[in-house]
């Protein structure tokens, strides 16, 4: 969103846009959210407090996108508390990469120590 420097600020702008849309449209039966990083999750997941905490720990892996997505999910949860919300992860598209494609060419010791893998986006 133009003029927004911080993901949280973008979330506030998008919340205003959402409020305006909800004032003119029927409430949805459910809401889907695109979230960049789902960690090891390979399938969509219902959004709740535990999932939000888990996804927040991954913010360093997608600092421009993850906090904004979580802020929007929070706003939607407040504006549409009865609508089920589901997170769909970019990482899920590549969760089943074969080991040869998912593994970086790094020393085995590093790979054993840190859970590094390719997720299929941004290199």
Task: Show the residue positions of the predicted features.
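Short, contiguous clusters of charged residues that form electrostatic/catalytic patches at enzyme active sites
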Residues: 16-19, 70-74, 87, 123
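Short amphipathic alpha-helices and their capping/turn segments at secondary-structure boundaries
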Residues: 18-28, 73-79
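Generic structural signal for well-ordered secondary structure
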Residues: 11-14, 45, 69
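Short N-terminal secondary-structure initiator segments
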Residues: 3, 38-50, 110-123
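Short beta-strand-loop/turn "lid" adjacent to the catalytic site in phosphate-handling enzymes
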Residues: 25-66, 84-86, 92-104
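ATP-dependent carbohydrate kinase catalytic cores
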Residues: 78-123
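A gly/proline- and charged-residue-enriched helix-loop-helix capping module
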Residues: 54-72, 79, 113-123
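Short glycine-rich, Thr/Ser-proximal phosphate-binding strand/loop in the N-terminal lobe
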Residues: 1-16
């Amino acid at each position: 969103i133009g003029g927004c420097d911080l993901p949280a600020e973008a979330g506030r702008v998008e919340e205003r846009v959402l409020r305006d849309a909800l004032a003119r449209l029927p409430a949805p039966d459910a809401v889907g959210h695109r979230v960049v990083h789902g960690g090891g999750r390979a399938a969509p997941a219902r959004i709740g407090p535990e999932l939000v905490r888990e996804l927040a720990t991954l913010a360093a892996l997608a600092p421009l996108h993850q906090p904004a997505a979580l802020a929007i999910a929070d706003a939607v949860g407040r504006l549409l508390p009865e609508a089920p919300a589901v997170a769909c992860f970019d990482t899920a598209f590549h969760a089943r990469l074969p080991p040869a494609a998912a593994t970086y060419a790094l020393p085995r010791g590093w790979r054993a120590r840190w859970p590094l893998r390719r997720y299929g986006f941004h290199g």
